[in-house]
């Protein structure tokens, strides 16, 4: 449909690569490119309006980026700026002469000057994008750090779901990735959800329990560290008694042995009674009882020194807590021997042993 407004054809001779027409009709924005004809010249036809017969239509050409007026049209100089213009008479004169040859492309551009020249992007996006959600389970080898896809699931989302779905689940472990679910949106409208689970190898947990420590003594025997006590066996005790008997020889006073036997007979009954009050698990073994007699070698005149030794049971009754056994012994230098420790801490320790006493005491306790 051709416009009822008067039209005018603007021309520029051939030579330039591109020419744009601008003026008061587009507020000098340079939005109307001219059309190049087969001869290489540029022209464009567009409707023009005048408010009064004396009004002017101002315009200018942009030739390869430069603002230039044309010598084929009238020129107006305003504050040093040159612009072309036409009047209503120029439009009537061009129409009467019929000298203007309309180019179909130029006419179409002139009439549709307000129409957008670029196809809107909305038409390109008219087709809806299909949305998918990808669920991946990735397992990580903690030893090598290698990550591999354990399973993958693709789910198509309905149209009701928003394309810009965000992450609602957050979480983080020692390794930085385990136990998290992440949804990543790419440029093509596909939502990708990565569910990362830890790759745990079922290793049996080994709990190291420190058992009771054991130590080895100088004799090669292994004993508990909680009860590191040395006990004498019955055979060792008998050997020591025999050695002591040999050392004593004939120098032992007969009166001393008689007095010792009398004192042992007197204490026989109290010792047996006191043993009844002891707990079975806390009885002192016979083989572990050691007596220590102090010997005085002040005067080797054969005088007898009397010493009192006190033996206390471990947990006896108050009445039988301490019993006294008196033994008379000749004062003479004894054979130096090493002493051994006993497990019963309540028994007093002496550097020497009386063999006859232990032998009879063992018989009494049996």
From Swiss-Prot:
Keyword presence, Transmembrane: no
Residues in cross-link Glycyl lysine isopeptide (Lys-Gly) (interchain with G-Cter in ubiquitin): 314
Compositionally biased region (Acidic residues): 233-247
Major localisation: membrane
UniProt modified residues of type Phosphothreonine: 216
Region of interest (Disordered), residue spans: 159-180, 217-366
UniProt-listed InterPro entries: AMPK1_CBM, CRP1_MDG1_kinase, Ig-like_fold, Ig_E-set
GO biological process per UniProt: signal transduction
Protein localization: Cell membrane
UniProt cross-references to Gene3D superfamilies, sorted A to Z: Immunoglobulins (2.60.40.10)
GO molecular function, one term: protein kinase binding
Cellular component annotations (GO), alphabetically ordered: cytoplasm; nucleotide-activated protein kinase complex; nucleus; plasma membrane
Membrane topology, as annotated: Peripheral membrane protein
CDD domains, per the entry: E_set_AMPKbeta_like_N
Pfam family, one: AMPK1_CBM
Residues bearing PTM Phosphoserine: 160, 288
Compositionally biased region (Basic and acidic residues): 265-284
Assigned keywords, A-Z: Cell membrane, Isopeptide bond, Membrane, Phosphoprotein, Ubl conjugation
Protein purpose: Involved in G-protein mediated signal transduction and in the regulation of polarized cell growth in pheromone-induced cells.
Family: Belongs to the CRP1/MDG1 family.
PANTHER family according to UniProt: 5'-AMP-ACTIVATED PROTEIN KINASE , BETA SUBUNIT, CRUCIFORM DNA-RECOGNIZING PROTEIN 1-RELATED
Protein name: Signal transduction protein MDG1
Organism for this UniProt entry: Saccharomyces cerevisiae (strain YJM789)
């Amino acid at each position: 449909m051709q416009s009822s407004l008067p039209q005018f054809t603007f021309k520029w001779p051939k030579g330039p690569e591109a020419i744009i027409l601008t003026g008061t009709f587009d507020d000098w924005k340079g939005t109307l490119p001219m059309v190049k004809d087969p001869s290489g010249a540029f022209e464009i036809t567009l409707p023009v309006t005048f408010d009064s017969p004396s009004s002017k239509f101002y315009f200018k050409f942009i030739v390869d980026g430069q603002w230039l007026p044309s010598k084929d049209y009238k020129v107006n100089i305003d504050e040093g700026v040159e612009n072309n213009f036409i009047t209503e008479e120029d439009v009537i004169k061009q129409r009467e002469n019929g000298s203007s040859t309309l180019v179909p492309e130029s006419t179409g551009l002139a009439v549709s000057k307000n129409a957008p020249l670029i196809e809107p992007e909305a038409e390109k996006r008219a087709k809806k994008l299909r949305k998918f959600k990808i669920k991946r389970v990735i397992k990580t080898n903690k030893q090598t750090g290698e990550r591999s896809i354990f399973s993958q699931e693709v789910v198509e989302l309905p149209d009701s779901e928003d394309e810009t779905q965000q992450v609602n689940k957050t979480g983080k472990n020692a390794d930085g990735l385990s136990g998290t679910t992440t949804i990543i949106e790419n440029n093509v409208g596909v939502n990708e959800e990565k569910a990362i689970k830890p790759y745990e190898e079922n290793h049996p947990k080994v709990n190291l329990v420190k058992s009771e420590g054991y130590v080895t003594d100088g004799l090669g025997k292994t004993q508990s560290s909680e009860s590191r006590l040395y006990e004498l066996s019955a055979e060792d005790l008998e050997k020591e008694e025999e050695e002591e008997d040999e050392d004593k020889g004939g120098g032992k006073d007969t009166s001393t042995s008689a007095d010792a036997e009398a004192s042992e007979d007197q204490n026989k009954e109290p010792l047996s009674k006191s043993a009844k009050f002891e707990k079975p698990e806390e009885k002192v073994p016979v083989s572990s009882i050691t007596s220590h007699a102090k010997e005085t070698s002040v005067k080797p005149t054969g005088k007898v020194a009397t010493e009192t030794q006190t033996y206390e049971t471990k947990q006896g009754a108050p009445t039988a807590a301490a019993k006294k056994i008196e033994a008379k012994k000749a004062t003479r230098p004894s054979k130096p021997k090493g002493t051994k420790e006993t497990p019963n801490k309540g028994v007093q320790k002496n550097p020497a042993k009386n063999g006859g006493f232990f032998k009879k005491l063992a018989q009494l306790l049996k």
